[in-house]
């Protein structure tokens, strides 16, 4: 039986062998691995990119005070980004399941069409959910647009839900019963609940009861203003961090019930406008560098298109 941390190590070793850079999590609150710059921004432009990383993900509304056996406000995804998306991406994914010890002949693996969209990031793609014996464990996406910009070449994204995958592999019904790491020399195993249960209880209390809506509204406006200011200085990466801060602040306000249905759409639109502007700013920043990681023919083609668009 693989422990939670061994599942991560196995996936890292597997994707390392496929030529992926093993990156570290983005060090800010994000709702999904897609928000990491290694996916959202690197999907833009003609430069090839292969990376894999664990991303802690926060969704304040999903908190259940540690009482729900499979719903968390803080959880982990394992993200793989392949650009351009290889023709054998499905085989590569199935190979990763075999590396984890799955017998593909003995398990019911289904690909259910499920196109993906993230309105706040202005991103969408063609995709599939992967169901393993009736439980969704992975999302496949071929990015079509990011920040409202068409993706050329297409980026392939594989997102593993680590807790769900581990629950199936370990045969447990409650996420807190997962073995995080094995005890040695007679020490007891460390459980997922030992590491994270208190955090779920306390963060749920903060998200639903103790966050300060007035402070959060002020913070949202400040992050929005700073993002716009940074883009005026052509600082796409710091601006993107402000967008992520604004997005998480919105999620906290949403969890607190401080935003009405009509206001919700307005706030999502404000974040989307920022994300689109940052995406364009980042693409321009790579263009100013001449897309140094791209094959010359690809770089020249996109540079010519951008120049034509600027002259129009």
UniProtKB/Swiss-Prot annotation:
Disulfide bridge positions per record: none
GO cellular component: cytosol
One term of GO molecular function: glycine-tRNA ligase activity
Reactions catalysed according to its record: tRNA(Gly) + glycine + ATP = glycyl-tRNA(Gly) + AMP + diphosphate
Primary location: cytoplasm
Segment forming the signal sequence: none
Biological-process GO terms, alphabetical: glycyl-tRNA aminoacylation
Keyword match Cytoplasm: yes
Enzyme's top EC category: ligase
InterPro entries given in the database record: aa-tRNA-synth_II/BPL/LPL, Gly-tRNA-synth_heterodimer, Gly-tRNA_ligase_asu
EC number: 6.1.1.14
Subcellular location: Cytoplasm
Keywords of the record: Aminoacyl-tRNA synthetase, ATP-binding, Cytoplasm, Ligase, Nucleotide-binding, Protein biosynthesis
Record text on subunit structure and interactions: Tetramer of two alpha and two beta subunits.
Stored PANTHER family: GLYCINE--TRNA LIGASE, CHLOROPLASTIC_MITOCHONDRIAL 2 (PTHR30075:SF2), GLYCYL-TRNA SYNTHETASE (PTHR30075)
Family label: Belongs to the class-II aminoacyl-tRNA synthetase family.
Stated name of the protein: Glycine--tRNA ligase alpha subunit
Gene expressing this chain: glyQ
């Amino acid at each position: 039986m693989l422990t939670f941390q061994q599942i991560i190590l196995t996936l890292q070793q597997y994707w390392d062998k496929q030529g992926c850079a093993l990156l570290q999590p983005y060090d800010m609150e994000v709702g999904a691995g897609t928000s990491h710059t290694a996916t959202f921004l690197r999907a833009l432009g003609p430069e090839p990119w292969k990376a894999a990383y664990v991303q802690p993900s926060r969704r304040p509304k999903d908190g259940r005070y540690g009482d729900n056996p499979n719903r968390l406000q803080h959880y982990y995804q394992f993200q793989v980004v392949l650009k351009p998306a290889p023709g054998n991406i499905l085989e590569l994914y199935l190979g990763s399941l075999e590396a984890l010890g799955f017998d593909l002949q003995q398990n019911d693996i289904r690909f259910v069409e499920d196109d993906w969209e993230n309105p706040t990031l202005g991103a969408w793609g063609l995709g599939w959910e992967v169901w393993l014996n009736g439980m969704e464990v992975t999302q496949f996406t071929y990015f079509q647009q990011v920040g409202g910009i068409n993706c050329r070449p297409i980026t392939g994204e594989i997102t593993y839900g680590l807790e769900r995958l581990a629950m199936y592999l370990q045969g447990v019904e409650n996420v807190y019963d997962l073995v995080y790491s094995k005890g040695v020399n007679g020490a007891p195993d460390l459980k997922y609940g030992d590491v994270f249960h208190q955090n779920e209880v306390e963060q749920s209390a903060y998200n639903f009861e103790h966050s300060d809506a007035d402070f959060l509204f002020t913070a949202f406006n400040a992050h929005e203003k700073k993002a716009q200011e940074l883009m005026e200085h052509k600082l796409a990466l710091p601006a993107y961090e402000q967008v992520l801060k604004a997005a998480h602040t919105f999620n906290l306000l949403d969890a607190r019930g401080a935003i009405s249905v009509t206001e919700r759409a307005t706030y999502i639109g404000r974040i989307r406008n920022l994300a689109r502007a940052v995406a364009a700013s980042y693409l321009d920043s790579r263009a100013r560098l001449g897309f140094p990681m791209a094959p010359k023919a690809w770089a020249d083609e996109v540079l010519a298109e951008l120049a034509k668009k600027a002259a129009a």
